[in-house]
């Protein structure tokens, strides 16, 4: 019981935001939000906001939206993360934001899954479960590493953005291309705490056999400490 309010936004563009330098690029095709009217008035007086809805972003330039992230964009290709689209159901409850049925599109790469962020106003805690049918790292990163799986380890790079937060999640990749090396059925757990990012064990199918990779990435300001162990078993490469 009670009164509810439905808010809808259509075909809106973000061009400038406080504390973000320069012009922005974000095109919001649709945003729908439903909340209890009394709760909405209470949130205007400082009470936690509660409600649910759906959004559809058709074009977002993450580089322009994250100018203070500290990410070295030189490690990425010229067009990587320049145009990202996303749709999702969402729910806000107090200090927690939940995204379900999340669908992401980054050029030729698609992803789907769920994301939950707790403690939005203080020290955020992230939980995610994402599935990527096919991923070619050369579409995103300049791969200058010498080892066959060094490109795979670079999947840890986005976690640098939240390295000082609490993060737990699972990334599954159906087919992964990295510097000419192909893997399938990749499962990558990730945990971050206090500037330390652990991905272990990363597992996948590799030319008839299996591969296991364990990585630990330490972030201290501008300094990175990257450690890894790679193990390959029962692979068949044919004639060399």
Model-derived features: where do they sit?
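Low-complexity, polar/charged sequence tracts that form flexible coils or short amphipathic helices
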Residues: 181-182
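Small-residue helix/turn framework positions
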Residues: 1-37, 41, 45-96, 101-110, ...
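Active-site-adjacent "gating/activation" loops or surface patches in catalytic cores
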Residues: 178
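Long, charged amphipathic helices and adjacent flexible linkers at domain junctions
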Residues: 150-158
């Amino acid at each position: 019981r009670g009164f509810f309010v439905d808010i809808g936004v259509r075909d809106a563009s973000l061009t400038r935001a406080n504390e973000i330098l320069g012009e922005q690029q974000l095109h919001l095709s649709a945003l729908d939000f439903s909340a209890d009217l009394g709760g909405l008035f209470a949130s205007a007086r400082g009470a936690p906001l509660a409600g649910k809805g759906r959004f559809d972003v058709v074009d977002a330039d993450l580089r322009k939206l994250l100018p203070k992230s500290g990410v070295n964009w030189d490690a990425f290709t010229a067009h990587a993360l320049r145009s990202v689209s996303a749709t999702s159901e969402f729910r806000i409850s107090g200090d927690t934001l939940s995204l379900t049925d999340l669908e992401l599109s980054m050029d030729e790469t698609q992803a789907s899954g769920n994301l939950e962020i707790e403690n939005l106003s203080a020290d955020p805690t992230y939980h995610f479960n994402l599935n990527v049918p096919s991923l070619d790292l050369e579409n995103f990163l300049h791969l200058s590493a010498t080892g066959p799986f060094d490109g795979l380890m670079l999947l840890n790079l986005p976690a640098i953005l939240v390295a000082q937060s609490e993060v737990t999640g699972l990334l599954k990749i159906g087919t992964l291309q990295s510097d000419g090396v192909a893997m399938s059925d990749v499962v990558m757990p990730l945990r971050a705490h206090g500037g330390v990012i652990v991905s272990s064990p990363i597992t996948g199918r590799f030319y008839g056999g299996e591969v296991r990779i364990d990585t630990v990435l330490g972030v201290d300001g501008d300094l990175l400490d990257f450690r890894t162990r790679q193990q390959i078993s029962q692979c068949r490469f044919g004639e060399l």
